[in-house]
Amino acid sequence: MSRKWVKIIAILIFILSGSYFVYNKLTKPNLGPKTTKLYKHGFLLLEEQIGTYIKEHYTGIEKIEFSPIYVTEEGSTFSNAYVSPTIYDKYGNKATLGDKIKKFIPLSYGLISDIVLDFDGGGNEVIELLDSNGKPVDVSNEEHLPKRAILTEASSTDENIELLVEDGQLIGVVKDDKGSPGAEIVYNTELHKGDARE
């Protein structure tokens, strides 16, 4: 009787471990530990840059919450990746920047358009964010967003938020330098495989 239970438990453990392996293979990007660390560090700084801009330049915001980092094109040294910030207004509505609005598809926030991630010849991280003028700012050695990388203008973000307000997805969110000082920013550096928009 006890041998039967041992076999059943062994089979269950085998099935569970196999399921865990398959789940990770399907949902987690296949990046090495050094590249994973670079993506997490770089995207945290990008999220701080985007979140700070929205919080400091818009009133009526309760919370800004970031999606996981979606890695969409694997197979080369560096994959395409992006994040999507979701804005919560004071009326309980929420809308995600980068999602399609009627027939308009706004830009996403990620590699190529907002951040450069690489390694230098010595294997050190290279992280560059774009400033308000589109010029790269080296933030490789920064743990938090430095003042020189804080955005004063972000036209694509402004257009996206304006469209979300016009579409009725957000209420009472207005561009104003008073900002929303009490707004909470929730960062997310978890890596996910695939595209959230599909």
Short names for language-model regions:
Residues 100-198:
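Extracytoplasmic electrostatic interaction patches
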Residues 96:
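Beta-strand acidic-aromatic groove motif in beta-rich domains, primarily in extracellular
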